[in-house]
């Protein structure tokens, strides 16, 4: 075992639990939300800013870091921790999500019923039982990802937790295609595990040995209960350090939660569980209640760039448009519950002005607020589980 996971408290009314994951770069208290640093940075924010607002772990995207600047360069620079100036734990995805999202769109697209907006050229992605062949979105060059190649790249990046390479079928895929895809993904996960263990003590020319690097498997099966169960039961027999719920999560929030409901009971209790790509306020609370320990999502900074601030207001669906004219003379902070730098120092009126004037500071302040808001939410959830108040928190925030 290359990381330790200890469960400290459980909620008697749900599957919610509070725990601690110990890694080589520090302890992660769960449930936890990790900001996403797609290309080695959390957009518009410094590592110190997110650390000082409570970030414990961040996620890096293997696909993007492989294409630019390249995993071998990152390895020569001492790994992603040293390269980007972040001294806490890092998790990297496998690259599969981004490759398949070029064709099918991402998790957020599925749940909101959107089709991919990026124009995909013919031949941009080809899938075989052995590998995925794709064109770089940067220069059109051709690249091949095998399970082994994905693990090699992630080892070069040097994350504390790495993920298996997997196929991402779309939510509209039928049962037969999803079942075939699941077989392929399970074969790829076995290959990832074998290569990871064979190279953990060394053997890659540009990567120092890292016996503390953990590998998570990914449960697939689309929206089909028997496939989700089969995947979870298959993976729990393999020596992974944790498991993710990935693949298609359905076409709306309710279906996503049903996928979590049908999957978690078949996952090992002693391993951390990560729900990939989910970060809305209500989803975080509801999926903690369903037994999820770890979350990641690009939404806090993406919303920030587009002038949307997270607020504690279910009637607004947790979102406030800072460019709204009603905020022009509003002296209050973005959110009275939040204690981030933005909310301590600036008014809604000032942030409204920044966005209307197209000042970059506006993007930074709202992005920082959004990240800090979710990080505080997760700390509050964790404390409520430890103190036996999670059911009250759930009712208070969601009105249920």
From Swiss-Prot:
Which residues take part in binding substrate?
Answer: 93-97, 166, 247
Provide the GO biological process annotations: queuosine biosynthetic process; tRNA wobble guanine modification; tRNA-guanine transglycosylation
- Region of interest (RNA binding), ranges: 277-283, 301-305
What top-level branch of life does the organism fall under?
A: Bacteria
Q: How is the cofactor bound?
A: Binds 1 zinc ion per subunit.
> Entry's InterPro entries?
ArchSynthase1/Queuine_TRR, TGT, TGT-like_sf, tRNA_ribo_trans-like
Q: State the similarity comment.
A: Belongs to the queuine tRNA-ribosyltransferase family.
Q: PANTHER family from the entry?
A: QUEUINE TRNA-RIBOSYLTRANSFERASE (PTHR46499:SF1)
Q: How does it assemble?
A: Homodimer. Within each dimer, one monomer is responsible for RNA recognition and catalysis, while the other monomer binds to the replacement base PreQ1.
UniProt protein name: Queuine tRNA-ribosyltransferase
Species per Swiss-Prot/TrEMBL record: Roseiflexus sp. (strain RS-1)
